[in-house]
Amino acid sequence: MIWSRKDEAGVLATSLKSQWIDAIDASPASNLIAFSSGKTLSVIDATDMGFRRDFQNERTVSGVGFDPKGRRIAASTYGGCALWYARIEQQKPTMLKWAGSHTGVAFSPDGNFVVTTMQDAQLHGWRLKDSKDMRMGGYPSKVRAVGFLSGGQLLATSGAQGAVLWPFIGSNGPMGREATEIGYDEGSLVALVATQPKHGVLAAGLSDGRVWWADPAGQGLNFVKAERGPAIAALALSPNGLRVAWADEEGNAGVVEA
């Protein structure tokens, strides 16, 4: 795993026993970088080359995600999610349990919820103050990407013919509420979504190679890449939410204004 700062050479960080690195996340708030290899969750500090923590999980780690302050890390595994404090060397994780294979993980921007993607085409979540379970299903395919927007009031996901939006308003999050869907197209699937938590917009990359940008509070979609082709394999939104970067499965890529 290589990380770099502007005008500086890249820095190499390796996994224990030279294992394949599976997942990665970084926290601008704490300058920490977390990555997983097998059952090991590793943490390094971008400002302190001597700092490193290696935490052992009971199962293989499939996804990692920092909380908003960069102090805790969620690690998705088979059977649920483990919560670790990023800097404490000797500790036991807090376990959030739910049967099944959890493939990715994210904190809500207010730090009150943790959401995982699952192998069996659904999401699961927990309200952290009481570990209350939240089930979010109904997807026709596996959810590969999630992202919060509108100050954390909405969670956008891939995995359907349109981008699925779950409400995260109030202390109950999506519990007892229905999801909505934008950009529905029967002939394609949303492969990826990209968001910026502070802004109320999102981008979606489709299985047929198209990319659109939208404001859910407005009307219509802006197809920033309208031509069809290989499925979109990577997608990102600029910090101001107004530029979209994409790449497809054949190595084509672009950056476009929304």
For each predicted feature, which ranges?
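WD40-repeat beta-propeller superdomains and closely related acidic/aromatic-rich repeat-like regions
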Residues: 1-258
